[in-house]
Amino acid sequence: MAQTHSFNGRKRVRKFFGKIPEVAEMPNLIEVQKASYDQFLMVEEPSGGRSDEGLQAVFKSVFPIQDFSGASMLEFVRYEFDAPKFDVDECRQRDLTYSAPLKVTLRLIVFDIDEDTGAKSIKDIKEQDVYMGDMPLMTDNGTFIVNGTERVIVSQMHRSPGVFFDHDKGKTHSSGKLLFAARVIPYRGSWLDIEFDSKDIVYARIDRRRKLPATTLLMALGMDGEDILSTFYKTVTYTRDGDNWRIPYSADRFKGMKIISDLIDADTGEVVLEAGKKLTARSAKQLAEKGLKAIKATEDDLFGSYLAEDVVNYATGEIYLEAGDEIDEKVLKTLIDTGETEINVLDIDHINIGGYIRNTLAVDKNESRQEALFDIYRVMRPGEPPTMDSAEAMFNSLFFDAERYDLSAVGRVKMNMRLDLDAEDTVRVLRKEDILAVVKMLVELRDGRGEIDDIDNLGNRRVRSVGELMENQYRVGLLRMERAIKERMSSIEIDTVMPQDLINAKPAAAAVREFFGSSQLSQFMDQTNPLSEITHKRRLSALGPGGLTRERAGFEVRDVHPTHYGRICPIETPEGPNIGLINSLATFARVNKYGFIESPYRKVVDGKVTNDVVYLSAMEEAKHSVAQANVELDERGGFVDEFVICRHAGEVMMAPRENVDLMDVSPKQLVSVAAALIPFLENDDANRALMGSNMQRQAVPLVRAEAPFVGTGMEAVVARDSGAAIAARRGGVVDQVDATRIVIRATEDLDPSKSGVDIYRLMKFQRSNQNTCINQRPLVRVGDPIQKGDIIADGPSTDLGDLALGRNVLVAFMPWNGYNYEDSILLSEKIVSDDVFTSIHIEEFEVAARDTKLGPEEITRDIPNVSEEALKNLDEAGIVYIGAEVHPGDILVGKITPKGESPMTPEEKLLRAIFGEKASDVRDTSMRMPPGTYGTVVEVRVFNRHGVEKDERAMAIEREEIERLAKDRDDEQAILDRNVYGRLADMIDGKVAAAGPKGFKKGSTITRELMTEYPRSQWWQFAVDDEKLQGELEALRGQYDESKKLLEARFMDKVEKVQRGDEMPPGVMKMVKVFVAVKRKIQPGDKMAGRHGNKGVVSRILPVEDMPFLEDGTHADIVLNPLGVPSRMNVGQILETHLGWACAGMGKKIGELIDVYRKTANIEPLRDTLEHIYPDNDRNEPVRSYDDDSVLMLANQVKRGVSIATPVFDGAVEADINAMLTDAGLATSGQSTLYDGRTGEPFDRQVTMGYIYMLKLHHLVDDKIHARSIGPYSLVTQQPLGGKAQFGGQRFGEMEVWALEAYGAAYTLQEMLTVKSDDVAGRTKVYEAIVRGDDTFEAGIPESFNVLVKEMRSLGLNVELDDTRDEQQQALPDAAE
C-alpha cells in the first residue's frame, strides 16, 4: 500500500470546491506593519553597519551638529537598544508602554582655529553613549502597548511626491477654457505651482502665494530673455533674396498645414502647391524627396513673427531690437536699414506651437536676475527690504537646499519617469533642468500634446506605514533638539564638557510620546475578534496629518479606481462620512520600498502561463495586458480561447492570446481579508457585501466557537496570522499541558545557546479592548509529536485553527406571525438553553486611593454605616473575593475618604464626648457595581506605590505569582536535566572510564546500570581517554551550567519585578483593579447577522415546541423573512443555506456509518464515503492514504456537518450544490415540508431550510438599555444629562412639545416645561407639597429660559421682564358699570 498519512484531529479538514490552483503563497497578513517598523528600528546591527534608512537616516540627516562659530562639532557614531525593562504582559498589567531604551554613541570634536589663517586642527575628541529616551517596540502581532492599552498605527495613503499635471476642467473661466497647471510636490519643503491663466500667460506660485510670471523664476535661475526663448523655441531663418525672402523647407514643420498662398520653390521659382490645399504628412515628405530645399516668402509672411535674438550695433553696443519683439513694418525697416540679410525668427505658428512663453516674457517687468530674485523675495517675505545676498540665500533655500527641501527617492523616481530625465535618485533637491522640463511639458500640454495625470491612480498615491510615520515624527523631535544643542555649545565652556552635557533628549522622547498618544493615525485597536484585529492592522486611511479631511474629500477620491484591482479592496470600506477614505489592503497586496502597493501576477511566456510570480505596482502594470485568474487553460498552461478578456491601462478588453503577458495569481487577490471570508461573494450585491465584511468585524467571540460548514478556505490563514490561535515555533514533543500553558520539548533546530524547551503561556479570560473575552484552549495532549507551524491552542473565535466568528444554525425562510417583519429574527428557546449564542464579556473596574489634602484615602473593609450583609463579598483588606457573584450596587472595593471638619452642633459635641466616636470624619467612597451589570469576579490586581506597606491581599497575589514562576523554572530545569543527562548517558555508555566518582574502578566499562547507582550530579566525574569525546563532554557540561545559570537569573529578575513597588501616577498610593466577567445570553433586542449583509434584531424567543419542524421532528433554530432576500440581492445566503443543508446531510450519513462500524468493525464503507467526499486533488486532504484511526477521527470530526471551502469567485456552482444534495440523499430543490409547531399542521408550501452561519454582533441590548429615576443634572441648564454613560435621563424634546401644543394640552405642557424639567424652585416646592399631602403647585421660570436671556444679554440685547399683572387688573373696568 502507498505511504500512509495519519491525521491528528487538530485541524479542520475542508472539501475544496476551488478549481484554480494556488500558485503564489499569500503574504503574511500583518507583514505590512511588522516589516515597516523593523526596517525603521533595525534593532540588530548588520555586520557591515546599518544602511541609510529608518532611524539611522534620521540621525545621519540631523548630525553632525556644529556650533555657530565652527569651533566644535557633535557627530553621530551609532545607536543601539538595551533589553526592554518589562515584557508585553507586564506592560499590559502595569499600564506601561512596551519600549526599549535607545542609546546613541556621540563623538564631540573640538577644533583649534588659527586666528590668522582660519585653518582648523583637531584639539580634542570625546566619545560617549547618551541615553535618548525609550523607543516603543512592536509586539509579535504588529501592535504597540502604550500606557497599558494595545494600539495600532494605521497606514496612511497620501499623494506621492513628484510632479503632477492637471487642468481645472474648465471651471475657472466662464468660457470653459481648460487652464493647465503643473505642481511639483516634495516630500518636505515648498510646493511649486506653474499654471496658465485665461490669457495664456504662464505663471509660477511658490507655496500657494501670489503668482509671478514663470519667466521671473527662470531668470532667477540665471537665464536671460534670449536663453529662455532659445530653450523653448526653434528658430527659422529668413534670408534676403532680392525683393523677397526665402526660408528653408522642412517636412516636419509644414505637414498638416493649410496653404494660404502658393508654395513657390525659391531656387526654380515653380509653384509646388497651390493656395487653399492642405499639405498632408505624405505629400510634405514627397516634396522633400523631390529636392525642395527652400521656399519663397514675402514680407507679409514676416509680419507677426517674433525675433529670436537681440539686434545689436556691435560698433556702439547699442541694442536696436530685443529678442521676442514682434516684427511689424517699422521693425522690418529698422532691420533692413541695419543691413541685415538674415533674420532669425521664433518658430511659432499659433497652431501647433503657441507663443505662451514669449508672451509671458513680454508681460514680465523684470529684466535681470537681481530684479527677479528681489521680486520672489518680496512675495515670500513681504515687508522686508531685499538685499542681493538675502534674496539669493532665500531663493536657494527654497528648492536647492537639502536641509529644507527633500523630494525623497520616490519623488525623484516619479519625476524622472514623468519628465524623461535621468537624475540619480540620490539627487533629492530640484535642479534647473527639472524646472525647465516641467515648464516645457506644461506648454506641450497646452499645445495639445500629452496627457494629464490622474491623481486617484495608485501610481500617484503611496502608503506611509508605521516606520515612515515614526521616522518623520522622530526627525521633528531631533530638529527641536538640534536648536537647543547649538545654543548650549555656544554658551558653555566646550573644552570641559562631554556629549552627555550637551544633550537633552526630552524633545525627541516627547515627539515619540505625542505621536503614539495623540496622533490621528495611532488608534485604539479594534479587538472584538481576531478578524477585526487583522483588518485594523491592514487598514489604509486617507485622513490624518498631511492627508485629506472628510469635509473636503470629493467623490473622485472616494471612488473605486481601476488601479485598485488587486491592491485595495473595492468592497470593504465604512458606510457613512468616511466611505472610500478608509480602505483595506487586498489579500495578496504588499507595499514596496517606495511605498506603492504591488500586486502579484503570473508571467505568460510565449502564450504559456508559467508559475513565476512577479509583483508590480500600478505604474508598471499599465504597460502590460493582464488576463484574469479564472481564464480557461489547457493542460500545458496555454489559453484555450483565441481571444482572452484582459485589462490594459485601466480598460477591459478582448485581446488575442498572443498579446497577453501577465495573468492574475488568484481570484481572491482583488478583495480584502474580510471580503474573502464571505462564501458566494460573487452572488451578492456589492452594497450588501460591504455590510457583510464590516459586520464580521463586529462579531462577538462566543463561549463555544464553531467553524462554518460553508467556508472559503481563508479561515485558517486569518486565525494563524492574527495570532489568536497559537502555532508551534519549532518541532518537538508535548511534555506537559494544562489550561494555562503548554510545555514542548524541542527536537528541531536545537541551538546550544537557546533552551531546549518552549513554554507557551495561554491567555485565560483576559479582557480585550472591546471588553470581549480572550481565552485560549490547548488542543494537544502529552506525548503528541508536533511539527513547526502546527496549531497547538485555539484562541477566541477559533475552532481547530479555523476562524469561527459565529455558529451554524438551522434556518427556515418563512414569515411567522409578523415576528420577522422588517428583518426581525425569530429564535428558538433551544438556542438560549444550549448557550449557542452566549458570550462572555469582561468589565474592568479600577479604584485608586489617593493622598488628599485632608489625609490619605484608605482601602478597607471598615466602612461607616454599611451593613455586614453589604460587606459579605469582601476580604479583610476590603477587596472582593475572586469568584464572588456581584449585582448592581454591590461593593467591589471598600474605600473611605477623610471628610473636612464641619462645625458641630452642641448635640453632636455631647455624643462625641460620650462615645468618643471619630467615625464621622470619613465618608464612604467605595467602588460599587454600576446599575444593570451582573457578573462574577474573575481577577483582582493590587498595585502599591514604592515604600507603601502591602496589605494581605497584595501579599497573597504576590505569593501566587512567585509560585507560578518557580513552577515554570522547575519544569524547564527538569526538561533540561532530562535532555542533557540523556545525551551524557548516550555519549559515555559502553566507554572505558579514565576516572569516575568515588568508589568507581578506573579502567572499567561504564554502563547505564552502573550509572544509576550514582546520583546524576556525580555523572560529570566520569572521564574517558578519548580526547575528542572528553572535549565534547566538557563542552556539554559548560553548556548545561550556562543554561542553568541563565534560568536562575531569569527567575530572580522576574521575582524582583513582582516584589518591587509599582510606578503610580502622582498622588496615588494604591490602586486596585477588579475584573468582572458577565455572561450574556442572546435576548430580544440583540443584533444578529449573516455573512452576506443580512442583519436583523431578535424580536422574540419562542418555546421549542412552537417552532416549525421537519418530518423527522427536527425544529428550526431560526426563522428569517424571505422578503429580506429579493430586494437586497444577496442571493449568496440562499446558496449558503442549500450547501449548509447538504453538509449537514452528509454529516448525518457519516454519523450512521460510524454506528455501523461500531457494530461490525468494518471501516471500509466509512473510508469509501470519505474518499468520495474528499476526491484526490492538490487542495484536499489525502484521505485515500489515511490509516484506520485517522479515518475514524476524521469521521467523528465531520459527523455534525462536513466542512467545505468555496473560495470567492472560484466557488461551488449550482451543479456542485445539486450533486452534494443528491449525495446526502436530500431533495435538489433544497426545500422541505415544514409543520407548524403550534397546530402540527403542515404548511401549504414547501419551505427553504438549511444551515446558515449566523453571527451575534457587538450591539447588545444590555449595553444600550438603561433606566434612571434620579441622577445628575447639567450645571447650566439644570436638565438631566443624556446617554447611558452619563446615567442620563429622557428629554421631552422639540417635537414632543409640538405634539402637546397640537392637542392644546396647556397645563400638561406647562408641567413638562417647568416643574417636571428645569424649574429648580418649582421642583423643590412640588416635592414639599407631595410630602405634605397637598396636590397643588405653582410653576416658576425654567432655568433654560434664564440661560436664553443671559445669551441674549451677551449679544448686547437688554432683555428685561416686567411684571405687569397688577396694572392690568386695575385697568379692567367693572362689569356692573
Swiss-Prot record:
NCBIfam families assigned: PRK00405.1 (NF001616), rpoB (TIGR02013)
GO biological process: DNA-templated transcription
Gene3D superfamilies linked: 2.40.50.100, 2.40.50.150, 3.90.1100.10, DNA-directed RNA polymerase, beta subunit, external 1 domain, DNA-directed RNA polymerase, subunit 2, domain 6, RNA polymerase alpha subunit dimerisation domain, RNA polymerase Rpb2, domain 2
Keyword annotations from UniProtKB, A to Z: DNA-directed RNA polymerase, Nucleotidyltransferase, Transcription, Transferase
Lineage, uppermost ranks: Bacteria, Pseudomonadati, Pseudomonadota, Alphaproteobacteria, Hyphomicrobiales
Protein EC: 2.7.7.6
GO MF entries: DNA binding; DNA-directed RNA polymerase activity; ribonucleoside binding
Record has Nucleotidyltransferase as a keyword: yes
HAMAP family noted in UniProt: RNApol_bact_RpoB
Record gene name: rpoB
Residues in coiled coil: none
InterPro entries in the record: DNA-dir_RNA_pol_bsu_ext_1_sf, DNA-dir_RNA_pol_bsu_external_1, DNA-dir_RNA_pol_su2, DNA-dir_RNAP_su2_dom, DNA-dir_RNAP_su2_hyb_sf, RNA_pol_bsu_bac, RNA_pol_bsu_CS, RNA_pol_bsu_protrusion
Reactions it catalyzes: RNA(n) + a ribonucleoside 5'-triphosphate = RNA(n+1) + diphosphate
GO CC terms, sorted: DNA-directed RNA polymerase complex
Pfam families: RNA_pol_Rpb2_1 (PF04563), RNA_pol_Rpb2_2 (PF04561), RNA_pol_Rpb2_3 (PF04565), RNA_pol_Rpb2_45 (PF10385), RNA_pol_Rpb2_6 (PF00562), RNA_pol_Rpb2_7 (PF04560)
Assembly description: The RNAP catalytic core consists of 2 alpha, 1 beta, 1 beta' and 1 omega subunit. When a sigma factor is associated with the core the holoenzyme is formed, which can initiate transcription.
Protein known as: DNA-directed RNA polymerase subunit beta
Species assigned in the record: Brucella anthropi (strain ATCC 49188 / DSM 6882 / CCUG 24695 / JCM 21032 / LMG 3331 / NBRC 15819 / NCTC 12168 / Alc 37)
Function: DNA-dependent RNA polymerase catalyzes the transcription of DNA into RNA using the four ribonucleoside triphosphates as substrates.
First-level EC class: transferase
Family per record: Belongs to the RNA polymerase beta chain family.
